[in-house]
Curated annotation (Swiss-Prot):
Belongs to the amidase family. GatA subfamily. The gene is gatA. Gene3D superfamilies: Amidase signature (AS) domain. One of its GO terms (cellular component) is glutamyl-tRNA(Gln) amidotransferase complex. Allows the formation of correctly charged Gln-tRNA(Gln) through the transamidation of misacylated Glu-tRNA(Gln) in organisms which lack glutaminyl-tRNA synthetase. The reaction takes place in the presence of glutamine and ATP through an activated gamma-phospho-Glu-tRNA(Gln). NCBIfam families: gatA (TIGR00132). Heterotrimer of A, B and C subunits. It catalyses: L-glutamyl-tRNA(Gln) + L-glutamine + ATP + H2O = L-glutaminyl-tRNA(Gln) + L-glutamate + ADP + phosphate + H(+). One of its GO terms (biological process) is translation. Its EC number is 6.3.5.7. This is Glutamyl-tRNA(Gln) amidotransferase subunit A. The lineage of its organism: Bacteria, Bacillati, Cyanobacteriota, Cyanophyceae, Synechococcales. Keywords: ATP-binding, Ligase, Nucleotide-binding, Protein biosynthesis.
Amino acid sequence: MAIAEWRQQLKLGEVSARELTDHQLARIAVVDPTLHAFLDITADRARADADRIDEALAAGESLPPLAGVPLAIKDNLCTKGIRTTCSSRMLETFVPPYESTVTERLWQAGAVLLGKTNLDEFAMGSSTETSAFGATSNPWDISRVPGGSSGGSAAAVAAGECMAALGSDTGGSIRQPASFCGVVGLKPTYGRVSRWGLVAFASSLDQVGPFTTNVADAAELLQVIAGSDPRDSTCLNVAVPDYCSALSQPMSGVRIGLIRECFDQNGLDAQVKRTVLTAAEKLQSLGAELVEVSCPRFSDGIATYYVIAPSEASANLARYDGVKYGYRAEGADALAAMTARSRAEGFGSEVQRRILIGTYALSAGYMDAYYKKAQQVRTLIRQDFDAAFQTVDVLLTPTSPTTAFKAGAHADDPLAMYLADLLTIPANLAGLPAISLPCGFDDDGLPIGVQLIANVLEESRLLQVAFHYEQAANVMANHPQGNFIP
């Protein structure tokens, strides 16, 4: 059920907010022992939120835009009075004394909090297997990963445990799991949505965005969470357009660029390539013009990212020293030993690996060769995008080179895991908005996602193209049943 449909049913009294909330909590009780999408379920809070909506409706009050909409929140967004762990032992008992800007805006808009979702530890991963509290499974095939790092949010939406969810995207952490789980995942322009209250991984790359079952709902959520925030100096102080009204704008004259370098990748699965190109042809049939474009440095994005992101992470995670908050190791006889032991015991192996990479890249004698060089390449990647947008409105690529892989398949091969974000990372480096939406299925019945990328602050155009494709292709109405969780 779409948010607009729910809103109508609520106003007509066909379903109450409490009834919908109880339905979602019952669904979670049935499927989450298998999926493990949630770390914490806030049932009492959810019922209280829903009751307030029903009481307001009974009193004749006008309802906010997300009244009674049951949501899940990735557990790296601070929620006041509710545990926020980042799926790490380091923050296992951390309860924030404040609310993140995005969640605050959701509650003001009437949304109902169902709980906090699992993720790769500190959002570092592409499979949700590095969580200190256990992996999440893919609803389409529980032997496979849901993607990452926002795998819990993607799986929860795909399995019908919530109507929508929030995630964060540093190098593809919304779009890649959206592709793997067959849902819509939107990464807004860097600075379009406040990061205040998002536990930082890589501050120049992180962005908050929604997971939904359809494009219109993504527009609804973005409408609520977008906008300037004086508490976040990187948040853009620009007007927020009406994203929902943009959906129905005609497609005639829209130019869509197919990035040559994306379709020439050696690791691109043949079924993924064929399905995404078919999606491009569908857009052409709707009135769009297809143009082949080149972004010569697109493939350099992954090497660039794995210098910049770990460097920023090594600085951001230095605050976890066992002194003020977070995990503190016992038995150390000196401050330095306590800090070292706290980090060794509190951080998982992938987080430690990235901290070490970042520390090395920033060290004396290597900073020029690695970090500064990576920033120069980042600028060149952005310039490639600038050149492409001189001739097209939207760029089209596969979201991921493959469909969801088996759990444990890349456990001993970090490089193979990193390559899962090969096609999503460049949009983060350039700060561009991008969306993944389902475009078909492989021979195993697993979802395939198509990625659309627009220029800075062109979310309206992005959502317009995605919406027209979704309405015409109607992909999810024809999905195979396969091993999808009951």
